[in-house]
Amino acid sequence: MHFRSHRGGVYYTPENTMPAFRDALAQGFDVIETDPTLTKDGVIVLSHDATVNRCLRHPDGSLIEEQQRIRDLTYEELMAYDAGLIKGEAFRGTKVPTLEELFSAADGTDTVICIDKYVKWYDGEKLDALFALANRYNVKVSYLVETFEQIEKVQLRDPDALIDWDGLSDEETLKAVCAKVKYENLVVWLYMDKPNFAWLKEPLRKTSKENCARVKQYARLGISNVSNPSDVKEAFDFEPYIIEV
């Protein structure tokens, strides 16, 4: 069984920060999932949200009232905010990290860094910059995608890339995906059939005995964002290759 750390860790550490990533590396997670995005001046930083308001605070701990998008802030402007206080004083002074900081921390380890969102949002030179950064480090990287076009964008830059498929999982789609990606490079992700995933409307993308068996015919099975101990036990019963916690 393998384990992926969601945003580095969201329960005891501030998500998508170096304290979370260092903790995940120390615990020996097989994969760390993160969400790169770009500042106004082109620095690749790590944040799930497009805005700063949920996770960041002013240095005095107060909320950021005005909606601010990361893409509208320079890196220097972003560094004015605190990314740790959302989890308490122990993390005061934590800043939004760059992707390079995470690659540097994972350099030479067996931990895979899973890149979410970026391939969906960016193309051309902005995507080239991410691959160039990855190539400067001895780090394993996987790319989370949901369309065939996104697979092609990744493979154009790295033909042997690790792919996390987070799209449709009907039989026809799975056949097409595995025709593009080698079995050993592919994980197909399903979601637990729980209230917190009510937003997911495609029933074939939720865990069931039938859905999991279908995925395993074509790829390694991942179960995404398992959020409590009872759900972990339930996820184990599907015998996945990897679970995200």
Where are the model-predicted features located?
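Phosphate-group recognition and catalysis centered on beta-loop-alpha active-site segments
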Residues: 1-245
